[in-house]
Amino acid sequence: MSQLNPKVGFVSLGCPKALVDSERILTQLRSEGYDIVPSYDSADVVVVNTCGFIDSAVTESLDAIGEAMNQNGKVIVTGCLGKRPEQIREAYPNVLAVSGPQDYQSVMEAVHEALPPKHDPFVDLVPDYGIKLTPRHYAYLKISEGCNHKCSFCIIPSMRGKLVSRPVDEVLREAERLVRGGVRELLVVSQDTSAYGVDVKYAEKMWRDKAYQTRLKALCEGLSELDAWVRMHYVYPYPHVDEVVPLMAENRILPYLDIPFQHASPRILRLMKRPGAVEKTLERVQNWRRIAPDITVRSTFIVGFPGETEAEFEELLSFLDEAQLDRVGAFAYSPVEGATANDLPDAVPEEVKQERLARFMEKQAQISAARLEAKIGTVQQCLVDAIEGDIAVARSKADAPEIDGLVHIQNADQVALRVGEFVDVEITESDDHDLYGDALPAAARPALDLKVL
């Protein structure tokens, strides 16, 4: 093999199960073009697969780490002792990374970070963050597949199956790669974001030497460690969603919830097989705003659901008045093949559905316009999406791409801006959907710490 290939030293300790782990790691290293070398001094980096079952094994593992540190200095630790990263870090604070047993991907990530694989122009055509169809500065981060709910209007479970959550460490590593590749905004998506981890009983995984549960709050805490906006989408209104709102108040993730309420009539919600405690929903929205005054609440609704009476539709309009939601999408009910709602009696005539949809959207447009108008005179941090001549198009923390509004920066020709850059914008005008304003000069902008947004 060519001497130009990167070289890895490897120490394998412990039981046969650990030996199999070592074999798998070595196989992956060789498949990526790394040379495996027998001595510390000829290695560019050393991997130590440890044992931690009994005290003598712990001592042997720590001694092996120490020997590798003394003779090489670039050491990645994995294996059973890696479940106690504080013990390793206390003895050897300068090890490059620590991961637990069977965590092959973390080992490979650490090797890649310390010693990138040799570039092969014939096969290495994909960046480590993958192929993306979004602009480079934002990306969707899918955390699960499928859904355990049986909403009567939906056929997603029959198409995509039951909830399958991705391991939290895998999600966090993907997010880390995306941010390293230039992503400034992570949009967390799934069929049911708030159910994340239910199917795996909130299994705990290690990332950056810290344990994280496969749970929405823990995921948000991990994502908040990255230098990017974090925006939550498709959040089913479980009570535990309330746990992430304090993180929004602390500016650790964006103060934004995309949470589909679907209706406000308890009877219609029961027919939809959705949560029906409307008064509690209103209380929760009010409480979110007390905790995080800048929170943006987006929701979606269905009008003209089978059996919906005029009185029940009026309940929905009253809910809009009370909730004062920032952004809303609405749809006239349309039968979907395979949905159980198709069998419900008292279908609403099409012309009535369309008339109710128009009334619904007219009321919400007034609410949204008033909430946007209240932002005139404020300074909003924005992410630049495009520059078109002397106008730049950006989004504030309140605006997800494609579905929400825009911030039109009207002095882009006077202030040096770049796509994917954060900029503070003084808002001067608004309309029913968008904001307009002027970017502040760089000297007038506060120093940006992307971890505190």
Swiss-Prot record:
Gene Ontology terms: biological process: tRNA modification
Task: Write down the top EC class of this protein.
Answer: transferase
Q: Extract the Pfam families matched here.
A: Radical_SAM, TRAM_2, UPF0004
Q: What is its main location?
A: cytoplasm
Q: Which GO terms describe its molecular function?
A: 4 iron, 4 sulfur cluster binding; aspartic acid methylthiotransferase activity; metal ion binding; protein methylthiotransferase activity
According to the record, cofactor stoichiometry and binding are noted as: Binds 2 [4Fe-4S] clusters. One cluster is coordinated with 3 cysteines and an exchangeable S-adenosyl-L-methionine.
Q: Which InterPro entries match?
A: Elp3/MiaA/NifB-like_rSAM (IPR006638), Methylthiotransferase (IPR005839), Methylthiotransferase_CS (IPR020612), Methylthiotransferase_N (IPR013848), Methylthiotransferase_N_sf (IPR038135), NA-bd_OB-fold (IPR012340), Ribosomal_uS12_MeSTrfase_RimO (IPR005840), rSAM (IPR007197)
Q: In this protein, which residues make up the domain named Radical SAM core?
A: 133-370
Q: Which GO terms describe its cellular component?
A: cytosol
> Where in the cell does this protein reside?
Cytoplasm
Q: Which SUPFAM superfamilies match?
A: Radical SAM enzymes
| Domain MTTase N-terminal, first and last residues per copy | 6-116
What reactions does this protein catalyze?
L-aspartate(89)-[ribosomal protein uS12]-hydrogen + (sulfur carrier)-SH + AH2 + 2 S-adenosyl-L-methionine = 3-methylsulfanyl-L-aspartate(89)-[ribosomal protein uS12]-hydrogen + (sulfur carrier)-H + 5'-deoxyadenosine + L-methionine + A + S-adenosyl-L-homocysteine + 2 H(+)
Key words of the record: 4Fe-4S, Cytoplasm, Iron, Iron-sulfur, Metal-binding, S-adenosyl-L-methionine, Transferase
Q: What are the EC numbers? A: 2.8.4.4
Q: Where is the TRAM domain?
A: 373-441
List the PROSITE patterns hit by this protein, alphabetically.
MTTASE_N, MTTASE_RADICAL, RADICAL_SAM, TRAM
Give the protein's biological function. Catalyzes the methylthiolation of an aspartic acid residue of ribosomal protein uS12.
Tell me the protein's name: Ribosomal protein uS12 methylthiotransferase RimO
Name its species. Stenotrophomonas maltophilia (strain R551-3)
Q: What is the lineage of its organism?
A: Bacteria, Pseudomonadati, Pseudomonadota, Gammaproteobacteria, Lysobacterales
